[in-house]
């Protein structure tokens, strides 16, 4: 019995039918089920029939449908068309080429509304030419609906009669009642994005119908759809022209500082508070608000333009068919008027911009060129335009169907291949709708359930299910660059049942519905079911829909003439919009700590104001000794009232103690810093044409405080450009290479790797030339390209010729054929040479494997309708692919199943499964009886050798199936593939059954080369005090060898291995949790004498130096999962890693990467940086304080989610050590300077209040209060934060130890802030009391006999001393003195004197009139100014001089060396990580430096006494030229020669292992015997076959030969 909760079938006329094909998940309640019956309608229901099923009552329209029984289609023709196999016969565009004149006549008759559109179908055609309609939102189509449907909007209610209910309150209540609060008009765009991004709504299932009425349970009481889908119109803007002013003002006054100053302005507007000029007092706030509004307006205007362009983009929507899934929008006259005005303004703006400016005319011309190019390209692509040039291969018309896109997908194409051509959607018994046509319309008018056709080079307007394409097999190319950043083309496949649809006439003769999961953010997952009624037997048919059948909004159609699809998600439900709001907002550490400084100033402000209120109230109470200074004194009538008013007067008077311009100044500074980073040419990657791009402009100072860097390996430390180097086939190893990891291993053995590497590479080059000649002579390989040959082995060419016997020849052929068949790559003609095919792979590994097979004569040249085309030694063969079982991270393997025909037509065919995957996975699935034991041992030893060289290894295997075995399995597979829920898990279970009992073919080894400058970059970061953790998904041995080659590990380190299981840890128990806990506890106790207590963790948080021990932690994913589980376990694991110099986490998932970053960041309270290049690094990047994305080979998703984007890993050293240190030091000096200068000015007023009972009178003329921060003192401080440099970028890179001051937080802390505040208090005393003592008795008389005792005149003295001392104080604290900064210091002083002279010459200055002439003319003024400034600056200058001479900081020592010219031999911008850097061989030694410096491992950036300074290492070793072996540029903290290890060439030094079982001992004895034989026969390289890192335990996950064999020998 069907479940009543399932959606009902749209078919209502047939009462009894057999059930169709079953599907899991969203099975519809079909009227063809036996349990479905009609009851006799009662009078209460009128003309509605009621259907009962399973106890539920379903309403149905009684109007019967047409008979859907299947006639004899062989006798049925329509419009003279009886052949549906030829695309050219039924394509809209091709059919009407001869009728353009008549169609253009119809186009000219098109009106703005669909009502006026009339067109006549041409005879013998499949539809209509696309007609462009100016279809506004308010347009309705009479052919689409019998009655108008109104879409709910605020203030516009829909109803059947078309009447509009204007009552907005009732409308809102009605909408909430019927749609369960599903109205989103009242929420902001940001909220909707955030909610949709954070919530997984995949369980919100939806059913979308085409050409069918909705079931009654999906309609409301008015017969309108219950489901409300978002419009396809997007709005990323915050404002509209009408709402910009109020919303922007409201947004700005969410800032507490702005609210605070607004309250003060409101208070100042009341005369009782004594503000002299309230209007002038509002100038600073008005300026800040206007500047911010202009900035916001410019930013939002760009978004508005982009929104308009996107929403008004044209696409082709099928018209003439009623879309039952949505209600038609009813647009009110007011909205029509607003939209008409908006369109008119846009048109006017476009007209003037395109016709009155040169840039606009050029843009208009470019648009016309693009349109012509698009139309030309659209006509040029046939059924397989991208493969047309392969016609020289003389393939059939079906040749060229590309493979599917399998990356990160867990879906399949096999179920689509199960349908015959007769099992399709088109019901030829139905008459085509003559009013149905594809018409151009705006993206914003696309709705769920619409049929959309997209042409070549057009973007996809919404997420839609692909129904058909111009290609005969329903495939199309899409570019997903806008979605995930990847530039390689991907293939999407139309549904098998609908690929025959080629025209608007065909689609009108179909009826179907889609059961879909809800919207979610996963770009690589989609599950749904496509259902229709079989025209032959009336059963409900089902075809599963997966991500391969989905075209996502934002993608672009490429190399395909057109594609047709059904819209399933629109607007905010599309995946690109859901992912738009994922990136979190980050705030820098200084910005967070700045709040505490502001609070301290508020406390100080309150104390001053409270004091003023108390004093003034007390004096008011003592009337005989006080005066009523204010008019309110007689009104208040009490001391308490007087004190209360005086408190707020003081708040207004001392408001500058909390600087209003601080926040906007910080924003300006960080913007400038981001611009400098972006324009740094030394961070520009010329190969990618990619500069360092700041995406988060407000965290630049965090770059200078990084203590931990978390890095991915593949694509980050390595290039992710895979090169096939070696392989093992039938126990024979092929290939010769000298890898970087091998060079690092040989270097640890004490070998001169430069000479050995040069010799090896010369021999490899000779073998390569020989191999190329032999390959050319062996066969006519049309795809052979010597430049792409990375696999060098002349032996394999000889074996392919049969020199080692037929058996080895067959093994090599089978191995290479497996490489050519088991993959998911695409091929396209090369643009320069169409006969050559370019490989388009989803991963570099697959590209390397397929490319190597091609070079050896097994070329994959394309796909046919039924399989793959492989050119074998010049002869093309077709292989029918039955199924492809995709790779995913949990399976760690992929397989393909090939059909093998019988030897005779009567023989039953067979199925061959080819599987490739991780060596450990393949070995565990090998058949224990059909594989030769010696062969497995040899292969395992070869794989061990490859992994030791740092190569990535894979294994290939196969299994032969009988046809009956395959048919039984594929039935279960199809059921799993049709499941909507848990489809991935079901598929994994089914594939696990068949991927067993495999026969080993061999193994491959691929090199992922290190990026340029990685070893030097890591060495510099380590010397800077930055700890590097490598978080990778690679196997442990590969990661370790890469770690040694890139300086993460060194030979002096002891590796502390943490793993959850294995024979070596049996003594710790069998429970993984117990094993990991015991291991970590043992290491803490034995190596560091720690127990893992809370007190030890608190002590570790205070320690920021480098670990004293020489240890490294190696942990795999299973052990890491245990280590992150539980507070105690996390604490112990973190303490262990904290005391180690390097940490390698291997086989970790993206979620584990993010968890490790969060653990370190939150627990240790340190600054973290995460760097990666792939989508699996996004979580880690977003979890760190600073996320850096590398624009690499794995797409740009990491770049899009990062805070900074760079081209290579080595650029992070300059980003951190140079720009990070500069930004941190600048901002750390600017902020206390900002508070300091305000304290001087504000406290001068406070001292003045002592002598007037704090009555609130102003010492300064009021304009001084406004311009002091705005013009007199702001520019020097801002220039300090933008341009100051402690040392040059070259010195910063050569002496990375200078960076440690940021890690130790020496430049910015509350102690420094309080010190500046105290200095400001002292200088405020000087600024006020020096002029006061000089003038308080009016001893100075001017020439005209007038005194200078007016408070405004005295205020000129105070202001002049404060402005001059502040600006000179800033100049003194700068490291960089140049004419530019000096110029602005002078200009700031000139502004003060210029304004005073200009303002006092105007009578508007009232009491201040002629003040400048009277004050500046007195010699006493200049004397007081000089003495006041001298006493302000002399104490600080004296203290700084004493400290620098007797207690210098390391930066001051290095600066003296730099200024003396000790680094002059290094060119400007010298980068030790740049491979193309100049070599510095001769450096002038230091012979007259008074005292050597200490820059050893204890360097902390703080001051040292003379007694503690000792001669040691860096940079003295640099300056004395002692860096010959260090390449002349690396700043190293240790120059001692490392102990050289003798090469190990025997097996006696193999690590001892705990073999607890007899099986293990027997296995080891056999393997040792095989190893010795191979060594004797020179089948293993003795240089590194037994090399092992010094480790506490056998390394986890290292696929030693015995490890692989033990996995095989275990019972499954």
Swiss-Prot record:
UniProt entry keywords in alphabetical sequence: ATP-binding, Cell membrane, Isopeptide bond, Lipid transport, Magnesium, Membrane, Metal-binding, Nucleotide-binding, Phosphoprotein, Protein transport, Translocase, Transmembrane, Transmembrane helix, Transport, Ubl conjugation
PANTHER family reported for this sequence: PHOSPHOLIPID-TRANSPORTING ATPASE DNF1-RELATED, PROBABLE PHOSPHOLIPID-TRANSPORTING ATPASE
EC number of this enzyme: 7.6.2.1
Disruption phenotype: Decreases phosphatidylcholine and glucosylceramide transport into cell. Simultaneous knockout of DNF2 leads to abnormal endocytosis and abnormal cell surface exposure of phosphatidylethanolamine, phosphatidylcholine and phosphatidylserine. Simultaneous knockout of DNF2 results in cold sensitivity, and sensitivity to cobalt, nickel, zinc, calcium, and magnesium ions, duramycin and cinnamycin (phosphatidylethanolamine-binding cytotoxins) and papuamide A (phosphatidylserine-binding cytotoxin).
Membrane-spanning parts: 253-273, 278-298, 599-619, 640-660, 1232-1252, 1263-1283, 1314-1334, 1351-1371, 1378-1398, 1419-1439
CDD domains: P-type_ATPase_APLT_Dnf-like
Assembly mode: Component of a flippase complex consisting of DNF1 and LEM3. Interacts with LEM3; the interaction is direct.
Organism this protein belongs to: Saccharomyces cerevisiae (strain ATCC 204508 / S288c)
Biased amino acid composition, Basic and acidic residues: 364-373
Outcome when changing residue 1592 to A: Loss of activity
Modified positions (Phosphothreonine) in chain numbering: 70, 782
Identification of the protein by name: Phospholipid-transporting ATPase DNF2
GO biological process: ceramide translocation; endocytosis; establishment or maintenance of cell polarity; phospholipid translocation; protein transport
Protein role: Catalytic component of a P4-ATPase flippase complex which catalyzes the hydrolysis of ATP coupled to the transport of glucosylceramide, phosphatidylcholine, phosphatidylethanolamine, and small amounts of phosphatidylserine from the lumenal to the cytosolic leaflet of the cell membrane and ensures the maintenance of asymmetric distribution of phospholipids. Does not appear to transport sphingomyelin, inositol phosphoceramide or phosphatidic acid. Required for efficient endocytosis. Required for protein transport from Golgi to vacuoles.
Residues recorded as bearing Phosphoserine in the entry: 85, 389, 392, 396, 403, 1542, 1592
Broadest EC class assigned to this enzyme: translocase
Residues engaged in binding Mg(2+): 712, 714, 1173, 1177
Result of altering residue 258 to S: Decreases glucosylceramide and phosphatidylcholine import into cells
Post-translational modification: Phosphorylated by FPK1 and KIN82.
Chain residues that bind a 1,2-diacyl-sn-glycero-3-phospho-L-serine: 1436
Regulation: Phosphatidylcholine flippase activity is inhibited by glucosylsphingosine, lactosylsphingosine, lysophosphatidylcholine and to a lesser degree sphingosine-1-phosphate and lysosphingomyelin. Glucosylceramide flippase activity is inhibited by lysophosphatidylcholine, glucosylsphingosine and to a lesser degree lactosylsphingosine whereas lysosphingomyelin has a stimulatory effect at low concentrations.
Highest taxon of source: Eukaryota
Glycyl lysine isopeptide (Lys-Gly) (interchain with G-Cter in ubiquitin) cross-link, renumbered residues: 938
